[in-house]
């Protein structure tokens, strides 16, 4: 059976532009990158994180003062990969706005919340889900014990990130993330994950 990612990439449209040197073609994502738009779609894993981090660093080098827009539609994924993106978002000089289209679950919700203050958005029918990290380990009892300690440390760190960006107390975050907690866009706004639910581009431009 063909990999669905390969199928999707084969269907990526090309955009043709006229330049002084003739025609030039881009895949649609490269063309949007010229407009400082990055797409974070699908599971968060190391390869995807590397691409997103590279694009963030490239856009910083192009113009360290101009905003970068990160569009998120992700079910979440690997915590370490997500934290690599998070750290890069905080590291670079340009403000990073975030917009959830579709869903932002697990690490996707953390990256949505990590956008620049007053620049975190979601579309009306998007879905956001937060929860504590999970893991499955096997091996010697002492190794399982070490992994358990590490995942608890990771849980505390993720909770602290939500506290920082959502304006909630640590106890509120811990209670909400204890199980899978699904939110509508309006509920995410009330919880502090986003700053505005938007229905048109004019709403975004009005806040810039």
From Swiss-Prot:
Protein's name according to its UniProt entry: ATP-dependent Clp protease proteolytic subunit 2
Active site per the UniProt annotation: 106 (nucleophile), 131
PROSITE patterns in alphabetical order: CLP_PROTEASE_HIS, CLP_PROTEASE_SER
Superkingdom of this protein's organism: Bacteria
GO cellular component: cytoplasm; endopeptidase Clp complex
Entry-linked Pfam families: CLP_protease
Top-level taxonomy: Bacteria, Pseudomonadati, Pseudomonadota, Alphaproteobacteria, Hyphomicrobiales
Biological processes annotated in GO: protein quality control for misfolded or incompletely synthesized proteins
Molecular functions (GO terms): ATP-dependent peptidase activity; ATPase binding; serine-type endopeptidase activity
InterPro entries per UniProt: ClpP, ClpP/crotonase-like_dom_sf, ClpP/TepA, ClpP_His_AS, ClpP_Ser_AS
Alphabetical UniProt keywords: Cytoplasm, Hydrolase, Protease, Serine protease
Location of this chain's protein in the cell: Cytoplasm
């Amino acid at each position: 059976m063909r990999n669905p990612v390969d199928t999707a990439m084969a269907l990526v449209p090309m955009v043709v532009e006229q330049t002084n040197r003739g025609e030039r073609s881009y895949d649609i994502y490269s063309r949007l990158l010229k407009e400082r738009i990055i797409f974070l779609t699908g599971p968060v894993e190391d390869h995807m994180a590397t691409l997103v981090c590279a694009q963030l660093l490239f856009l910083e080098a192009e113009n360290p003062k101009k905003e970068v827009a990160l569009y998120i539609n992700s079910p979440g994924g690997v915590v370490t990969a997500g934290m690599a993106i998070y750290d890069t978002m905080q590291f670079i000089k340009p403000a990073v706005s975030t917009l959830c289209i579709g869903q932002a679950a697990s690490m996707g919700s953390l990256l949505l919340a990590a956008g620049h203050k007053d620049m975190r958005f979601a579309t009306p029918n998007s879905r956001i889900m937060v929860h504590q990290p999970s893991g499955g380990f096997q091996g010697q009892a002492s190794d399982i014990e070490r992994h358990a300690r590490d995942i608890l440390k990771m849980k505390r760190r993720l909770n602290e990130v939500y506290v920082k960006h959502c304006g909630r107390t640590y106890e509120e975050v811990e209670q909400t993330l204890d199980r899978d907690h699904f939110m509508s866009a309006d509920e995410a706004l009330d919880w502090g994950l986003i700053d505005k639910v938007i229905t048109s581009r004019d709403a975004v431009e009005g806040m810039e």
